[in-house]
Every structure is written in C-alpha cells, then in structure tokens.
Amino acid sequence: ENYSECYHCPGVHPQLNALTPYDLGEDIPARGMWKGGWQPLVGEALTMGLDKGSHERPWLKGMTETDAKRIQYFAVWPNLLLSLHPDYLMVHMIEPLSPGRSRVVCDWFVHPDTMKLANYDFSDAHGFWDMTNRQDWHVCELQQRGTASAMLPPGRYSELEASVQAFDLMVADRYAADGKRTARGWAAGLAPGDMDGIDFSDRQAARAAIAAKLNASVESR
C-alpha cells in the first residue's frame, strides 16, 4: 500500500517530493496482476539521487527523451515492486514472514557497460533510496501498530489512492475465492495502450479523453 501512493510523500519524503512532486504524474490503466504509473522529474533533476538528482551515468538502453524525464513505478502483485529510472532499475521484493512481519530486499540494476566507466559512482542513488526506504519502513511500522488497534475505525480512500484501492481489491478478491474480480475505479475498463495518443500537457483534456475511452469500453460490453 505504501508503494502504491505518494499522498504521504510531502511529509515523509521531502527529498523525494522535491524531485518528483506527489501531485504530478499519471496512473497507467491496467488489467491483471499489476498496477503502475509514472511521475515526472522536475527542474534540473536527472534521476532519483542525492545532490538534487544530478549524475553522470548514461541512460539505460532503449530510453527515449520522454522516458528520461520520468520515474516509472510498477507493482507486480503480490510482492514485486519495479522502479524504472532513466539510468537504473530498482527492485523491491517483499517476503511475508508472519501477519505482522515482512522482509524487504532492495536491489539496484545498472547496465554492465556503465559500471566499467572510469567515473562510475552509484553512491548518490544508493544513498537516496537507503534514506527513502528507511523513511517508508518507519511509517509502515507505525501504521501497522495503528491498524492493529481496536480503537482505529476504517478510513476512506482519497482521490490520490486509486492504486491502493486496486491492491486492496485484489487481496479481497483472493480472500473471497469465488472466481470473480472486482472492477478497479476509473481505469477498470481500460487496458494497456488505450491511452496512446492522449496529450498529457493539458490535464483537463486528458481526463476527458480517458473518460470518453472508458465510457466507450463500458458501452461495448
């Protein structure tokens, strides 16, 4: 759930939020056992790292100019998290140990040719995400204690938590074990590729275009 939203980022991750503001970016409509989206790098930031995101590493192969100004996040349910940066891939694996404990393993992947460069230095990215991981783990531990309390009433999802709801629906569907899959919010009727051609420079127009595609998808069933 923590990975699936950035509503907590301004307060918990001020360093991250300065590079990719929590209220910018888009979800990627999806079906199946995954959910994802992207956030734009702002200002002169080139990646997620210390020193305001500056670095001298080349892009990963296949990156476009558009890709190089985005951080893309994908959750492959139930426990694989992929964070694609212009210059490296970060992977989290979450291993449940008990109802109240998990082991989180974080790995970074860089192109072998990049690691051979004379000026290769990954300490900025490693240091940034070590800091961010620890910030997340701390608040997750606090939340775990809070939700275990009988005094805590269930809360509502905000408009910035559609991906959290999608994850929770997946878990609920598995517990129900009736073979049915609950539709996911505004993106329930769209599949990957359905947003091709939408201009995200005008957010209002983009939302209207997505709504039109969603309505057309629902009407065609």
Feature locations, PLM:
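C-terminal catalytic domain of Rieske-type non-heme iron oxygenases
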Residues: 1-221
